[in-house]
Amino acid sequence: MKITFLGTGAADWYYEEHGNMKGYRRNSSLLIDDCLLIDPGPNVPNALEVFGKDTYGVKYIINTHNHRDHYNADTVEYLKLRGAEFYPFESGETKVLGKYTVSAYRSNHSTCEKSVHFIISDGEKRLFYGLDGAWLMYEEVQAIKEKTVDLAILDATAGENLGDFRVFEHNDLHMVVAIKAALEKNVNRWMISHMARILHTEHEILAEKMAKHGFEVAYDGFETEI
């Protein structure tokens, strides 16, 4: 399973204002095997072009929730015109999209009745996509424990800002370290994404710090196999 981070930023990154800024991050979005898109946010068409992806290759679109940085109707229409289909999910649902089995779990976010995290399997590898959201919910933890997850991607919006009000719907770095400690034996590899512009250091500093805790820090355009 190949994954490409089309965006790794939180909602406070705006292309018009910050696009030329060093370390610019688009709104968070992930592409699996160049065909399964998680979160059709406003920056996705630009990211697909910049990172050399075939827009006609995107076949499946799924969405964690409808906040503006994760869902954009124009992006969905843009990809539908190129052959993609949008598949809505509610928590507790499992759907088969081609070779992928996609299960949705309620997430701890401000729109929790609609906001979900995903576990995606291609029959060989298992990916947990856990943003947006704070502490993981019971059902998704049990699903992670049932069968080894090859890669877990966690929300790290709030940085090191201990006591930040966002921790009731987003993780800070202390929280992701604690989650990893509790699920270490169930997950082979850990990454963080969804970094807020105003709450994080430069990427290189963050990556060095989090490597000490066994985390990789995603950045726009980063591509890896799991």
Label every PLM stretch briefly.
Residues 30-32, 92-99, 224-225:
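Short acidic-hydrophobic surface loop/beta-edge motif
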Residues 8-10, 35, 40-43, 66, ...:
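Active-site metal-binding loops of divalent metal-dependent hydrolases
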Residues 80-92, 99-104, 212-216:
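Active-site regions of enzymes building and remodeling cell-envelope glycoconjugates
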Residues 4, 60-62, 87, 103, ...:
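Hydrophobic/aromatic beta-strand patches that form the interior of the parallel beta-sheet core
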Residues 35, 42-87, 148-152:
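Active-site metal-binding motif and surrounding structural segment of the metallo-beta-lactamase
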Residues 135-223:
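Cap/insert and terminal regions of metallo-dependent hydrolase folds
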Residues 1-50, 114-131, 151:
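Conserved beta-strand hairpin/beta-sheet module of binuclear metal-dependent hydrolase folds
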Residues 93-148:
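Catalytic core of the metallo-beta-lactamase
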